[in-house]
């Protein structure tokens, strides 16, 4: 499969497997974010029958938050994760095969069939900064405060018109006079989508996983 118009973010809620790409393989498991740049030919090989993914598409690249990076693109010390937490593909031997290889390509919101005469993973090496990667949510080190902090403090990724936040287990609002959770309010600047993958959320009650 190749998405020729959008970058993709896959969050693994259930299941394990391997993300196979023309630049190498990434093993994934529960809690992994998979970032797949547009134009990447890939295949998901699943190891289990029960697999649940949260799937997002972006017409702009998906980055780490700008405020966590210096002018050279390096993650700063106050970032909730660092470069060592990001895993890149493991190189595999090229598939020197000929035949009819069907590639599903998404373009202009349609799926097109392309037949390759050689295996799309017939690659002997790659160079540059264009590759898929993974980051596990359990490596996200939350930033906490004695009083309530706004949701952007949990930001993990950003694109042109949306952000992705990771609300993980943490101490929160531990000042003796702090309001323990935000009171009823209206967010007129942003639409919010919450995906429950584990545990309970501080400001919502009686919600089950994947609600």
What does each model-identified segment do?
Residues 1-211:
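Jelly-roll (double-stranded beta-helix
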């Amino acid at each position: 499969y190749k998405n020729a118009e959008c970058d993709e973010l896959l969050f693994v809620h259930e299941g394990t497997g391997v993300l196979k790409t023309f630049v190498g393989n990434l093993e994934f498991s529960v809690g992994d974010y998979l970032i797949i740049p547009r134009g990447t030919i890939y295949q998901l090989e699943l190891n289990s029958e029960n697999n649940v993914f949260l799937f997002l598409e972006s017409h702009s690249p998906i980055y780490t938050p700008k405020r966590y990076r210096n002018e050279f693109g390096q993650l700063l010390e106050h970032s909730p994760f660092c470069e060592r937490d990001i895993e890149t593909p493991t190189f595999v031997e090229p598939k020197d095969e000929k035949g009819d290889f069907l590639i599903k390509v998404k373009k202009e919101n349609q799926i097109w069939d392309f037949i390759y005469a050689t295996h799309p993973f017939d690659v002997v090496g790659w160079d540059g900064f264009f590759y898929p990667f993974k980051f596990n949510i359990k490596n996200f080190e939350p930033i906490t405060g004695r009083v309530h902090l706004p949701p952007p403090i949990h930001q993990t990724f950003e694109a042109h018109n949306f952000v992705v936040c990771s609300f993980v287990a943490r101490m929160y609002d531990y000042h003796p006079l702090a309001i323990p959770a935000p009171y009823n309010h209206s967010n007129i600047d942003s639409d919010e989508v919450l995906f429950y993958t584990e545990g309970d959320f501080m400001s919502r009650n009686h919600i089950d996983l994947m609600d």
